[in-house]
Amino acid sequence: MPTTLLQSDLPGLPLRHRGKVRDVFDIPRERLPAGTPPGDYLLMVATDRLSAFDVVLPDPIPGKGEMLCQVSNFWFAKTAHLMPNHLTGIDVASVLPEGVDPALYAKRAVVTRKLKPVPVEAIARGYLIGSGWKDYQRTGKVSGIDLPDGLRQAEQLPEPIFTPSTKAAVGDHDENIDFDAMVKQVGAEMAERVRDATLRIYKFAADYARERGIILADTKFEFGTDADGRLYIMDEMLTPDSSRYWPADEYEVGTSPPSYDKQFVRDYLETLDWGKTAPGPTIPAEIIERTRAKYGEALQRLAGISVD
């Protein structure tokens, strides 16, 4: 069983942000290896924290952060020909404070460029599920995009669509917006660049996953720019937390297919009399272990990496 990390505390590295899953630290210039190009850098740590319905739950999933980080790193490398990413290749151990065990962070942390985030979640959908299905049932559209009549739950869309959403703070909920609203927020050129990159990467990843018996139903990306306005993909990439993966052999139109993510946790929480606000309830050990196994299976099938 891997070591569990619920929260990272690294003396000498200023904490910049503690999100639902990731802790992000500024790296002082003197801690960077000699010859590091000018600019600001971050240490991003994927913890084992578990969130559902935008609430961080009290029980972690052992090794989840390592699995998420490895999936992201796999996809960053796999898609580097399509889009530059925030990774630097700087060894994590070289920037850790003295006395910190590098083994604890080796598989769950990365050194990244510090970028200016594009303030919109970039979502690609290839199938009608989740909030997209709810929008379609209500309006016949998803994020203002007209879709054919008579589509069923989990049905593949004629073409993948781009459906942006707002970026919510921890504890708040993202809200779907249409493309025009995104243009007003970030400008037409940036909106088009993000949309085109999102769909290009989604199509590539969906084809790759399909060859391995997995359907990539939808996914969420985050983008940022450097001082020269160059666009990068950042944060996490095509993980079971940011994406909806289905086993192709269990896919059936008209149903909500099982997924390689924390669906066991969400299903359990739906049985409770809980208002979906903090603090969250305790999760049974069986649910934790089944969820951990699902993350591990996704890592194995997509990247060929086995977990302990």
From Swiss-Prot:
GO BP, sorted A to Z: 'de novo' IMP biosynthetic process
PROSITE patterns: SAICAR_SYNTHETASE_1, SAICAR_SYNTHETASE_2
UniProt xrefs under SUPFAM superfamilies: SAICAR synthase-like (SSF56104)
EC number: 6.3.2.6
Molecular function (Gene Ontology), one example: ATP binding
Pathway: Purine metabolism; IMP biosynthesis via de novo pathway; 5-amino-1-(5-phospho-D-ribosyl)imidazole-4-carboxamide from 5-amino-1-(5-phospho-D-ribosyl)imidazole-4-carboxylate: step 1/2
This protein's UniProt keywords: ATP-binding, Ligase, Nucleotide-binding, Purine biosynthesis
Superkingdom of the organism of origin: Bacteria
Catalysed reactions, as listed in the record: 5-amino-1-(5-phospho-D-ribosyl)imidazole-4-carboxylate + L-aspartate + ATP = (2S)-2-[5-amino-1-(5-phospho-beta-D-ribosyl)imidazole-4-carboxamido]succinate + ADP + phosphate + 2 H(+)
Database matches in Pfam families: SAICAR_synt
EC class of the enzyme, as a word: ligase
Gene Ontology CC terms, in alphabetical order: cytoplasm
Family of this protein: Belongs to the SAICAR synthetase family.
Protein name: Phosphoribosylaminoimidazole-succinocarboxamide synthase
Organism name: Stenotrophomonas maltophilia (strain R551-3)
Gene it is expressed from: purC
